[in-house]
């Protein structure tokens, strides 16, 4: 049976949530949550390991982006679920070359609708991710390869402007 990336994202979110509440590391938390279906699917495990590895390796950088775009909000005041959805989506946007940023943002919004305790969470997640995405795009920090992954006309325009 094919494992869908949404299922993996949800498991990673649950692992991130667990480490916020318990004294454990992300690998242990994730290990408890993986189903046999995911473990048996090499593509699922590749995506899982890549995404969780990106989050682990770049958590402080990702958190800096979140902090810069959550005006008047201390990171400790952001709901744990929302904060971890933002972390996961930003890791995808920044480090998963084969996933279009809009897919990462849409997945984050849908996961927020499912897991967050308030309807406003999905709007909050959308607003923060959109602002960060626009900054990253303007700064030329999104490196995606392949058809449909990024608007290359905007990237070329930015490249031409910076080379002047």
Curated annotation (Swiss-Prot):
One Gene Ontology CC term in the entry: cytosol
Single Gene Ontology MF annotation: RNA binding
Keywords, comma-separated and alphabetical: RNA-binding, Transcription, Transcription antitermination, Transcription regulation
SUPFAM superfamilies, per the entry: NusB-like
Biological process terms in GO annotation: DNA-templated transcription termination; transcription antitermination
This protein's record includes keyword Magnesium: no
Matching Gene3D superfamilies: NusB-like
Matches recorded under Pfam families: NusB (PF01029)
PANTHER family: ANTITERMINATION NUSB DOMAIN-CONTAINING PROTEIN, N UTILIZATION SUBSTANCE PROTEIN B-RELATED
Role description: Involved in transcription antitermination. Required for transcription of ribosomal RNA (rRNA) genes. Binds specifically to the boxA antiterminator sequence of the ribosomal RNA (rrn) operons.
Annotated family: Belongs to the NusB family.
Annotated protein name in UniProt: Transcription antitermination protein NusB
Organism: Chlorobium limicola (strain DSM 245 / NBRC 103803 / 6330)
């Amino acid at each position: 049976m094919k494992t869908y990336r949404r299922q993996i994202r949800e498991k990673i979110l649950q692992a991130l949530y667990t480490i916020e509440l318990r004294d454990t590391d992300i690998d242990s938390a994730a290990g408890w949550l993986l189903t046999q279906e995911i473990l048996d699917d090499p593509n699922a495990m590749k995506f899982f390991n890549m995404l969780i590895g990106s989050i682990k390796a770049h958590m402080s950088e990702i958190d800096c982006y979140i902090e810069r775009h959550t005006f008047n909000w201390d990171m400790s005041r952001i709901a744990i679920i929302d904060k971890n959805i933002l972390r996961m989506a930003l890791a995808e946007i920044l480090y998963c070359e084969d996933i279009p940023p809009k897919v990462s943002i849409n997945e984050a919004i849908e996961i927020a609708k499912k897991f967050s305790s308030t309807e406003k969470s999905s709007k909050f997640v959308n607003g923060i991710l959109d602002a960060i995405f626009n900054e990253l795009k303007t700064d030329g920090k999104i490196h995606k390869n392949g058809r449909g992954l990024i608007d290359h006309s905007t990237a070329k325009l930015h490249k031409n402007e910076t080379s002047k």
